[in-house]
């Protein structure tokens, strides 16, 4: 039993092995037959033998299907029979193209691709044929690719055909390196392809339905794919019809090749900073805008042929390859480099398309008159004979130069350097040149002439040759104390030890002297000194008649006597009277003093500044020789022991009439000290002795203009006291403990003092505004001063032949006449 069972097992084992062996042989036979079929099929494909012999089965099937589709397309189309000449030219078509040919089905399969794809993409033809295009393109381009493959078979409007043209940019895998080597497909980079073509619809010839339905027409997309070369990898040298340009990210020129001048007429310099959109034809702007959008999205574009405007009119056809250059550090876009191919000459060169093209058209043409003007405006070191020779060559220019009948010949006045210096000084006073300084403005000049105080019948007399040109001869003669010639030499006083005259030698050696004429007036800031050029004030207040550093006397175009006094319309600045001289007896032992009026009004005022009798001895000695004007300017905390007196050689001394200057009221109560000596002049007062009355019409209008200008100028300066009472002024600056307060200009009023000897004395009181009424209300030697109103001052203006203020009924009658 056991032996029989063992024999059966062996038989079964042998039978199973035979079946397996037969199965293996059958499978091997099938594979061999299949391989023979694929081998035969591969050799049927239009591929080289070395390629087809190495294809796997899947590749053979893929390529065969693609070939069958292509054959179907070719059979569906109306193909012409090629002759021998066309057959020979077929091999040159791909060489002429800057790309490869690709045919896609409606589902995106690449049924055909030319064999030169390896040259541009690194991938071979059989590696791509039959595959889906979506396997080798950028994922961001898939949606656009599907839109390009879609063909709408819906109803079409009458008279309008469906657009089958396609042009788009596609990023595809590339296995080529910059050196031309091939890399693995996994390390491939993206390369931008400019795909242009159309959708072709193939209708089958079999009109009979198959299997009960009719097949739809087959559509395919035929494309020519042109890769855009990188500017750094351009192998072919650029010809004369090509120029390079670089642009910023907003498409403005940052560089342009010089060859654009020969092609379009533009200079590279005039394009820098200008947008490229300014030079596009209007009909191509939409297409170029979309192209630039694709450039920033995909990195490279080719614009195709578009019209670019020439400089002098017309346009040229251009095709541009633009590439975005990225920064190697941060991979950010940096600039745009364009390779521009000009494919035509200038078309319609006489047609204007933009405003830039009108610049050359509207350029003015030079005429003979312009040439003549250039001869005069051109500055050359040539003599007049050479100029005449040039004009002689232009007959029209000579006729224009010749004067016609009735023409007014104006002689040229070539001023000296002094005139230029004077004009420069006048320009330094742009604001305050209405009264005091000659105005360079014609309007101000006309106003000043209209406001002149001189009557129309009175004409200014010529000036003396040895006098100041700014002074009128008639006024200068009145200012002369003696019959000798008036020699005025305006100098800048300097500190010196020797006296200027024998009469004041004892005092000038010990008394400090101002360093500059501006210190005679008042202390101002450096900025204000620059604004107020006090040349006239320096001349009027100059002490020394000996010329040390003489100023250059310059002729002025406008005489100051033609300038009218400034007449304000408000109550802040009112007209004041001229010096109204009253008789005063020379033998009066105790002349009236104004100090009593000031001593009674000390309410919260600074301490009184006094002057001893010894300090006024020199003043008493010279009281009968000249005007004695003592001005005190409190500036510190001590009082000097000596005063400064006037020089006897002052050109303004003598019996003359003048108008007191306005005063910068100080901070302190003024005390006039004449108690020690009966004939000494009053400190801080103006004493005009031995004077003859002169009518107001003969007063110096230049001094009037100076006074009005100073009264008009509103300045606030701490610790300054400026008192001016005419010409020939002597300054004394004792220190005062008074604090600095704000000062304001006020009216100057004259008071009549009693006398016995007929001498005329005038006291000018200059006071702060807050003490005006109280000072005027004080009594002087038992008789009170009348409190005057604004009408009083207006009515009591200087009247010819009148020396007294109106009182009582006379004042009322005068007011009635005014009203």
From Swiss-Prot:
SUPFAM superfamilies for this protein: HLH, helix-loop-helix DNA-binding domain, PYP-like sensor domain (PAS domain)
Region described as Interaction with TSGA10: spans on this chain: 1-402
Activity regulation text: Induced by reactive oxygen species (ROS).
Motif segment (Nuclear localization signal): 711-717
Cross-link (Glycyl lysine isopeptide (Lys-Gly) (interchain with G-Cter in ubiquitin)): 533, 539, 548
Positions of post-translational 4-hydroxyproline modification: 403, 565
Domain PAC: 303-346
Main location: cytoplasm
Chain positions covered by the region annotation CTAD: 779-819
Domain bHLH: 18-71
Biased amino acid composition, Low complexity: 582-613, 632-655
GO cellular component entries: axon cytoplasm; cytosol; nuclear speck; nucleus
Molecular-function GO terms, alphabetical: DNA-binding transcription factor activity; DNA-binding transcription factor activity, RNA polymerase II-specific; protein heterodimerization activity; RNA polymerase II transcription regulatory region sequence-specific DNA binding; sequence-specific DNA binding; transcription coactivator binding
Region of interest called ID, as start-end residue ranges on this chain: 577-778
Record-linked InterPro entries: bHLH_dom, HIF-1_alpha, HIF-1_CTAD, HIF_alpha-like, HLH_DNA-bd_sf, PAC, PAS, PAS-like_dom_sf
Post-translational modification summary for this protein: S-nitrosylation of Cys-793 may be responsible for increased recruitment of p300 coactivator necessary for transcriptional activity of HIF-1 complex. Acetylation of Lys-533 by ARD1 increases interaction with VHL and stimulates subsequent proteasomal degradation. Deacetylation of Lys-702 by SIRT2 increases its interaction with and hydroxylation by EGLN1 thereby inactivating HIF1A activity by inducing its proteasomal degradation.
Protein's name according to its UniProt entry: Hypoxia-inducible factor 1-alpha
Source organism per UniProt: Eospalax fontanierii baileyi
């Amino acid at each position: 039993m056991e032996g029989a069972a063992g024999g059966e097992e062996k038989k079964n084992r042998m039978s199973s092995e035979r079946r397996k062996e037969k199965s293996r042989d059958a499978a091997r036979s099938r594979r061999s037959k299949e391989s023979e079929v694929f081998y035969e099929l591969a050799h049927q494909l239009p591929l080289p033998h070395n390629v087809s012999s190495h294809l796997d089965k899947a590749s053979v099937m893929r390529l065969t299907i693609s070939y069958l589709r292509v054959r179907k397309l070719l059979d569906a189309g109306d193909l012409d029979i090629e002759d021998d000449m066309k057959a020979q030219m077929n091999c040159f078509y791909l060489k002429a193209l800057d790309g490869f040919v690709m045919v896609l089905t409606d589902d995106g399969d690449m049924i055909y691709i030319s064999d030169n794809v390896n040259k541009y993409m690194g991938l071979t033809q059989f590696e791509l044929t039959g595959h889906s295009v979506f396997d080798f393109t950028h994922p961001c381009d898939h949606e656009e690719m599907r839109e390009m493959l879609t063909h709408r078979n819906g109803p079409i409007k009458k008279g309008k055909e469906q657009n089958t043209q396609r042009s788009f940019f596609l990023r595809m895998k590339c296995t080529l390196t910059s050196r031309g080597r091939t890399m693995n497909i996994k390390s491939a980079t993206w390369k931008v392809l400019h795909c242009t073509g159309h959708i072709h619809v193939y209708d089958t010839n079999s009109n009979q339905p198959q299997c009960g339905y009719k097949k739809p027409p087959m559509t395919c997309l035929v494309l020519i794919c042109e890769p855009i070369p990188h500017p750094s990898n351009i192998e072919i040298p650029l010809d004369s019809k090509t120029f390079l340009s670089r642009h910023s990210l907003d498409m403005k020129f940052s560089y342009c090749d010089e060859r654009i001048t020969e092609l379009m007429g533009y200079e590279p310099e005039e394009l820098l900073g200008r947008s490229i959109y300014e030079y596009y034809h209007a009909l191509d702007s939409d297409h170029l805008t979309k192209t630039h959008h694709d450039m920033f999205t995909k990195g490279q574009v080719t614009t195709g042929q578009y019209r670019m405007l020439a400089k002098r009119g017309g346009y040229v056809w251009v095709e541009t390859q633009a590439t975005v250059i990225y920064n190697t550090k941060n991979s950010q876009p940096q600039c745009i480099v364009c390779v521009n191919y000009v494919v035509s000459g200038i078309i319609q060169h006489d047609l204007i398309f933009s405003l830039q093209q009108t610049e050359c058209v509207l350029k003015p043409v030079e005429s003979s008159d312009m040439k003549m003007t250039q001869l005069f405006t051109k500055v050359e070191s040539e003599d007049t004979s050479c100029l005449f020779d040039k004009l002689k060559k232009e007959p029209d220019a000579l006729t224009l130069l010749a004067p016609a009948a009735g023409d007014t010949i104006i002689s040229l006045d070539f001023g000296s350097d002094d005139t230029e210096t004077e004009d420069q000084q006048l320009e330094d006073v742009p604001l305050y040149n209405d009264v005091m300084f000659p105005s360079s403005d014609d309007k101000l000049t006309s106003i000043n002439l209209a406001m002149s105080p001189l009557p129309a019948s009175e004409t200014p007399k010529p000036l003396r040759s040895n006098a100041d040109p700014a002074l009128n001869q008639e006024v200068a003669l009145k200012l002369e104390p003696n019959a000798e010639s008036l020699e005025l030499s305006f100098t800048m006083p300097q500190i010196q030890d020797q006296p200027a005259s024998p009469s004041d030698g004892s005092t000038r050696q010990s008394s400090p002297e101002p360093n500059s004429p501006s210190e005679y007036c008042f202390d101002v800031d450096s900025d204000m000194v620059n604004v107020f050029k006090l040349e006239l004030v320096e001349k009027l207040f100059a002490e020394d008649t000996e010329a040390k550093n003489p100023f250059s006397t310059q002729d002025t175009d406008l005489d100051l006597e033609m300038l009218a006094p400034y007449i304000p319309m408000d109550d802040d600045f009112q007209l004041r009277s001229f010096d109204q001289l009253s008789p005063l007896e020379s033998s009066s032992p105790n002349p009236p003093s104004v100090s009593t009026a000031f001593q009674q009004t000390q309410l919260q005022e600074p301490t009184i500044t006094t002057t001893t009798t010894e300090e006024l001895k020199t003043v008493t000695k010279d009281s009968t020789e000249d005007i004695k004007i003592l001005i005190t300017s409190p500036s510190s905390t001590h009082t000097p022991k000596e005063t400064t007196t006037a020089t006897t050689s002052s050109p303004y001394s003598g019996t003359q009439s003048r108008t007191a200057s306005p005063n910068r009221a100080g901070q302190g109560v003024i005390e006039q000290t004449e108690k020690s000596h009966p004939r000494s002049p009053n400190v801080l007062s103006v004493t005009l002795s031995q004077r003859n009355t002169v009518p107001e019409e003969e007063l110096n209008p230049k001094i009037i203009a100076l006074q009005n200008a100073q009264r008009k100028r509103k300045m606030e300066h701490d610790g300054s006291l400026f008192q001016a009472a005419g010409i020939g002024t002597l300054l004394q600056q004792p220190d005062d403990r008074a604090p600095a307060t704000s000062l304001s200009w006020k009216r100057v009023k004259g008071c009549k003092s009693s006398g016995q000897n007929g001498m005329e004395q005038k006291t000018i009181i200059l006071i702060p505004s807050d003490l005006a009424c109280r000072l005027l209300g004080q009594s002087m030697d038992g008789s009170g001063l009348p409190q005057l109103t604004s009408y009083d001052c207006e009515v009591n203006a200087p009247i010819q032949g009148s020396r007294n203020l109106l009182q009582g009924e006379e004042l009322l009658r005068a007011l009635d006449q005014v009203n």
